[in-house]
């Protein structure tokens, strides 16, 4: 029950092709591929954008002095 032979998968593939058609499956594959590519490009852009921003933030706060006065409780 847990293992399927190659014939099971071929029958499932045939049913999917008959139900959806090859054009629809090709469009789904193209859309999925472009979505994955867009995700990878976005992750790459996010990785390059965050590194300089972190360095700039640290430099701007290092030159400032903050004075704080505390009040006793009670």
UniProtKB/Swiss-Prot annotation:
Any one cellular-component term (Gene Ontology): TAT protein transport complex
Sequence segments annotated as region (Disordered): 50-74
Biased composition (Polar residues): 56-68
Main subcellular location of this protein, as a coarse class: membrane
GO biological process, one term: protein transport by the Tat complex
NADP found in the keyword field: no
Keyword terms of this UniProt record: Cell inner membrane, Cell membrane, Membrane, Protein transport, Translocation, Transmembrane, Transmembrane helix, Transport
Membrane topology per record: Single-pass membrane protein
A molecular-function term among this protein's GO annotations: protein transmembrane transporter activity
InterPro entries: TatA/B/E, TatA/E
Transmembrane annotation, as ranges: 1-21
Localisation per UniProt entry: Cell inner membrane
Family: Belongs to the TatA/E family.
Record note on quaternary structure: The Tat system comprises two distinct complexes: a TatABC complex, containing multiple copies of TatA, TatB and TatC subunits, and a separate TatA complex, containing only TatA subunits. Substrates initially bind to the TatABC complex, which probably triggers association of the separate TatA complex to form the active translocon.
UniProt function note: Part of the twin-arginine translocation (Tat) system that transports large folded proteins containing a characteristic twin-arginine motif in their signal peptide across membranes. TatA could form the protein-conducting channel of the Tat system.
NCBIfam families reported in the protein's UniProt record: PRK02958.1 (NF002813), tatAE (TIGR01411)
Protein name: Sec-independent protein translocase protein TatA
Organism: Verminephrobacter eiseniae (strain EF01-2)
Gene this chain is encoded by: tatA
């Amino acid at each position: 029950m847990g293992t399927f032979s190659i014939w099971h998968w071929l029958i499932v593939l045939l049913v999917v092709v008959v139900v959806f058609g090859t054009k629809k499956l090709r469009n789904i594959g193209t859309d999925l591929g472009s979505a994955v590519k867009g995700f990878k490009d976005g992750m790459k852009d996010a990785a390059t954008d965050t590194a300089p921003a972190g360095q700039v933030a640290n430099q701007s706060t290092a030159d400032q002095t903050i004075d704080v006065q505390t009040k006793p409780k009670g």
